[in-house]
Amino acid sequence: MQPDPQPHGRGREKAAGAGPRLPPPVTAPSVGRPASVLPHKTANVRDHYRIGKKLGQGQFGTTYLCVGKPDGGEYACKSIPKRKLLCREDYEDVWREIQIMHHLSEHPNVVRIRGAYEDALFVHIVMELCAGGELFDRIVAKGHYTERAAALLIRTIVGVVEGCHSLGVMHRDLKPENFLFASTAEDAPLKATDFGLSVFYKPGDKFSDVVGSPYYVAPEVLQKIYGPEADVWSAGVILYILLCGVPPFWAETESGIFRQILRGKLDLESDPWPSISDSAKDLVRNMLIRDPTKRFTAHEVLCHPWIVDDAVAPDKPIDSAVLSRLKHFSAMNKLKKMALRVIAESLSEEEIGGLKELFKMIDTDNSGTITYDELKNGLKRVGSDLMEPEIQALMDAADIDNSGTIDYGEFLAATLHMNKLEREENLVSAFTFFDKDGSGFITIDELSQACEQFGLSDVHLEDMIKDVDQNNDGQIDYSEFAAMMRKGNAGGANAGGVTSTGGTGRRTMRNSLRVNLGDILKPNEN
């Protein structure tokens, strides 16, 4: 990942006469890490809450179930390791996230913050528990939905955008995964979560740091001069996916996706669009106008007939093929992650000899794991000129559990070149690992065993099979497995197995999408 040429943390160009950012940033030393994230000492989170089971693993922290000691109420606690915060700007990012959650806490469709706590190792954000699951998962589980249902969802999503903008907040990472239902009840409200990339802004402010998630990022973000209009584009992408099951602009690589976003044609003609109402298509067009000055504002979206008038959005079920595509799109391909790790650990001593010695040299305390500081110091000793964000990206590609350390196998998976991982004998070796009975096929039972070995839970095994199973026989043969491993690796896939559609880097979040405009703007190869 190449750092942006501008200084880290400088991402905004002020319009003439624009005032200072509100609220003011944390008072901190101008260099190095500040003493704390929060501007005041806090109680220990465990004095007020019992921390329970892990609910989820994000890129920036781990979320746990917690129970309030006074009231017995259930909440979510997001714990962010402070060792992941490398500099003053990272500390400010976390503090800003907390401020923004408080700032928006009265909105009925924003997850409500309960409080923030800090100790020597973590910042803990306690918030409302949303136990109803992600937006797309609910739709897929239900098995059918209508344009009218999609209109209600978009009304909620864009209502959050309008609420943010009216309070001087830009979300900057709107995507379906960041919307959760409050409970499993049929009428549970949809809530926006994860304000880790959000910023305060004033009218006229322009930003230049490239953040977000590939399918949902607006073209002006890629061009590094944007404002709150970018949130409306992202909401428009969600609407497009709700209506047809796939993103409007897609390709096999990140750079290909970005090229399509900048100049690809918006398809509103092929199936299922002929059966979608003209009013819905009109709204999609106006939310996905590349010129942000001509794009609908959030308020204009909420005033559109398709949103306002229940009679305009048809109540007939949307084609079941859309639901099927939506299911596949939203299912994460965990199989590839596991396979990359298997290959990395089975390579020959000759291929990994240098890396093995490097690992030993970096692991100064011979613990069998390396920390960020050990990695940074070790690379410096061998003359590496990697910048801190690049070292952190290397670390984080392997540190899947946010433990702050990586073991030998993880180190290999994160540092080996993709061409070694793709060699035929290595693919055969990885396939054999999953094909426990040597039948020549990976079955759903064998996948289940592998997931258990890798500590993966809540995995949709059927979807993992379907993502790869080209001939629809319910299992994965070698040719299908090899095609999956080679798919999408051109143009900067990383050997750590982090999917190209997985959003931003780690806590050092600015300029986190690997955007090379020269690469994006080159002529299409097809």
Curated annotation (Swiss-Prot):
Catalytic residues as annotated in Swiss-Prot or TrEMBL = 173
Q: Which residues bind Ca(2+) 2?
A: 399, 401, 403, 405, 410
Q: What is the name of the protein in this document?
A: Calcium-dependent protein kinase 28
Matching Pfam families? EF-hand_7, Pkinase
The entry's Ca(2+) 1-binding residues are: 363, 365, 367, 369, 374
Q: What controls how active this protein is?
A: Activated by calcium. Autophosphorylation may play an important role in the regulation of the kinase activity.
Domain named Protein kinase: residues: 49-307
What lineage does UniProt assign to this protein's organism?
A: Eukaryota, Viridiplantae, Streptophyta, Embryophyta, Tracheophyta
Catalysed reaction(s) here are: L-seryl-[protein] + ATP = O-phospho-L-seryl-[protein] + ADP + H(+); L-threonyl-[protein] + ATP = O-phospho-L-threonyl-[protein] + ADP + H(+)
Which GO molecular function terms does the record list? ATP binding; calcium ion binding; calcium-dependent protein serine/threonine kinase activity; calcium/calmodulin-dependent protein kinase activity; calmodulin binding; protein serine kinase activity
EF-hand domain residues: 350-385, 386-421, 422-457, 460-491
Q: Which residues bind ATP?
A: 55-63, 78
Recorded source organism is: Oryza sativa subsp. japonica (Rice)
